[in-house]
Design a protein with these regions (language model features):
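Residue-level signal for inorganic ion chemistry
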Residues: 22, 26, 168, 208, ...
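Metal-dependent amide/peptide-bond hydrolase catalytic core
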Residues: 1-3, 10, 185-390
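Acidic/His- and Gly-rich active-site-bordering loop/insert found
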Residues: 1-102, 125-129, 360
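Hydrophobic/aromatic beta-strand patches that form the interior of the parallel beta-sheet core
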Residues: 70-72, 137, 165, 279, ...
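Acidic/histidine-rich catalytic neighborhood of metal-dependent amide-processing enzymes
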Residues: 109-183
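Acidic-glycine-rich active-site phosphate/pyrophosphate-binding loop
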Residues: 81-97, 161, 176-187, 321-322
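Buried hydrophobic packing segments
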Residues: 39, 113-123, 150-153, 208-211, ...
Length: 390
């Protein structure tokens, strides 16, 4: 393996030093500027052929200039820390405790970003880029807007990869797909009246009550199907002119996750069924508007099909060989993410897409998030070997 990749202990330590530095660089969604500049500087230091930050704030690095285009993507943004007092170390300290690096983003997903940056640079040093172009992106606002950042990158930079590797945490297990997602808003409409005379109005919350019951029943029904999806009411609110008035509008936010075999069109039918017979109800996609750290406007339409690449697909077979070359053994299993990623965009374009990244995804977003730094090194080895084989 050392002969194949030119891996050295010094290079591995430099990778971990950078990884810990990224954790120390706080990068909440829409606040990734410092992280982008840090990554940009490291790419330049490592000898990337081209490095830039695009209009939405994604940092983009390129090595090679061949016809086959390989893309490694990691998002730079992290969810917020609301409980720093509950962490065993400060959440942006990147301290090592019992061999584990602790900190927000240690799993989700600064290990994958660091490993892919160093892998692309190593591939260039080792002369593995003949006929290939490798892009590494640190993308923005993934935690809110799956894929929107990549859509901007591909369009603005006129890039269409042949292969995309999503470096989300998988505990360094080859991951063949993830669930789909539809996020929808249902509204009910009432008539405001004084709280002392509720019979003169129509309570929008009461209008919503039957719909909520139907949501619960739909989730139970989905659970009876092996490998079925889920639906959850994740937010509820109402509008009222005062606390002594009948609410004139009620709004619920639904998060529907789709497993392979389900589709977005099916969910649209489910939404219609939820409001069937309710004259004062409507539904729509939960479209989200965000502004990136550069001022770029992001519009997110949360409706994505589930996807899964075949075990015998050429990319899967190549990943399996890269795994065996890098680690001296065949992969024991494959994985499937039960959450969404930026893969939704390359998959929708027909790009061969697969997942692989360091860290246990069950620890993502959690208090005391942590990752084994050796797994970050291993991911770098895998990415480098994959570049060689593609």
């Amino acid at each position: 393996m050392e002969k194949q990749t030119g891996w050295t202990e010094e290079y591995g330590q430099a990778l971990i030093d950078f990884y810990r530095q990224t954790i120390r660089t706080r990068s909440y969604s829409d606040e990734e500027g410092d992280m982008a500049r840090l990554t940009e500087a490291k790419m330049k230091e490592l000898g990337f052929d081209e490095v830039y930050i695009d209009s939405t704030g994604n940092v983009v690095g390129r090595v090679g200039n061949g016809p086959k285009v390989i893309h490694f993507d990691s998002h730079m943004d992290n969810v917020r820390v609301n409980d720093p007092e509950d962490w065993i170390v400060p959440p942006f300290s990147a301290e090592i405790v019992d061999g584990q690096v602790y900190g927000r983003g240690s799993v989700d997903m600064k290990g994958g970003l660091s490993a892919s940056v160093f892998a692309a640079a190593l591939a260039k040093r080792q002369g593995l880029l003949e006929g290939k172009t490798v892009y590494v992106t640190g993308s923005v606002c993934e935690e809110y807007c799956d894929g929107v950042c990549l859509e901007h990158f591909y369009r603005e930079s006129n890039v269409r990869p042949d292969v995309c590797v999503i470096c989300e945490p998988s505990d360094n297990t080859i991951t063949l797909g993830h669930t789909g997602k539809v996020q929808a808003v249902i509204k009910t409409y009432g008539v405001s009246a004084h709280g002392s005379a509720p019979d003169k109005g129509v309570n929008a919350v009461y209008e919503m009550a039957e719909i909520i019951r139907r949501v619960e029943e739909l989730n139970r029904k989905l659970g009876t199907v092996p490998g079925g999806g889920t639906i959850v009411l994740s937010h509820i609110s109402c509008e009222t002119v005062s606390l002594n008035a009948v609410p004139s509008q009620c709004r619920i936010y639904l998060d529907r996750r789709l497993r392979p075999g389900e589709c977005v069109e099916q969910v649209k039918g489910e939404m219609e069924a939820l409001i069937a017979g309710r004259q004062r109800a409507s539904w729509e996609l939960g479209t989200l508007h965000r502004t990136s750290w550069t001022g770029g406007e992001l519009v997110y339409e949360p409706a994505h099909e589930p996807w899964k690449i075949d075990e015998d697909a050429p990319l899967t077979v190549t990943c399996r060989q890269a795994y065996e070359n890098a680690f001296g053994q065949k992969p024991e299993r494959y994985d499937f993410w039960d959450f969404g990623t930026n893969a939704v965009v390359p998959v929708s374009m027909g790009v061969a897409t697969i997942g692989f990244g360091p860290g246990e995804y069950k620890l993502a977003h959690m208090t005391n998030e942590h990752c084994d730094p050796e797994k970050v090194k291993d991911a770098c080895r895998f990415y480098t070997e994959l570049i060689r084989l593609l």
